[in-house]
Amino acid sequence: MGAPKLKWTPEEETALKAGVLKHGTGKWRTILSDPVYSTILKSRSNVDLKDKWRNISVTALWGSRKKAKLALKRTPLSGSRQDDNATAITIVSLANGDVGGQQIDAPSPPAGSCEPPRPSTSVDKIILEAITSLKRPFGPDGKSILMYIEENFKMQPDMKRLVTSRLKYLTNVGTLVKKKHKYRISQNYMAEGEGQRSPQLLLEGNKENTPKPEENGVKNLTKSQVGGEVMIMGMTEKEAAAAAARAVAEAEFAMAEAEEAAREADKAEAEAEAAHIFAKAAMKAVKYRMHSQTR
């Protein structure tokens, strides 16, 4: 048996996150040799840093260890250095929102590049933008929406599946209307505005319109203050947690349905291709027989 693994301290986690932001993911040896972090991470190896960063990444993005294990199986390992750096900034922001007591500000993307869309909320906005911009009489189909997103945004490896899932979700909640495989924005959504938007869009809209603490002098709320705010809104913390759990369950159900639909579409496409090949072979056989009979 090897030596027991030491539990990571908050100082070590902070040093790892700061090191990844400074040097990039995969630069474990560089982080360990950096004099700023070497003292704090002296008891850690390259493998320790790699494993811990993987746990931080997936847990921050998926929210639980069970979902993290599924995500590790599905998440592609390929990606450019620029994508890795942008992902690292997002992960650290999701994990704790600060490094060394300072707010993390994502660097501006270089000229000529598109910032990769963030999950769910930004994808919903991109889908609505695509439908509005394409200006089809009865609305664009899913393929046209995907093509628009591919042409105007940097597509992540799993973006196609996510867009399919969000199209189904937005249809279920009434934001979109689907008819004969074409999507259009519902009249209720356009007429009632914010009241009919999906919870994700409302949350992001509120977040964007909220001034930063340093701009209006408002301090960050403590846990007790947050609990008080929840109570004022008419929900206890337990009710809020239950509502959040239901939202997560609905999102997972929608994702599962989207994956099943994608599998069925792939199967139908394969069957159609096989039928096409069979038809071509049959035509060749008929032509050969007719040619033989004319001799």
From Swiss-Prot:
PROSITE patterns: H15 (PS51504), HTH_MYB (PS51294). Pfam families: Linker_histone, Myb_DNA-binding. Gene3D superfamilies: 1.10.246.220, Winged helix-like DNA-binding domain superfamily/Winged helix DNA-binding domain. HTH myb-type domain confers double-stranded telomeric DNA-binding while the H15 domain is involved in non-specific DNA-protein interaction and multimerization. Belongs to the histone H1/H5 family. SMH subfamily. Signal peptide: none annotated. InterPro entries: Histone_H1/H5_H15, Homeodomain-like_sf, Myb_dom, SANT/Myb, SMH1-6, WH-like_DNA-bd_sf, WH_DNA-bd_sf. Residues 239-277 form a coiled coil. Binds preferentially double-stranded telomeric repeats, but it can also bind to the single G-rich telomeric strand. This is Telomere repeat-binding factor 3. GO terms for biological process: nucleosome assembly. It comes from Arabidopsis thaliana (Mouse-ear cress).
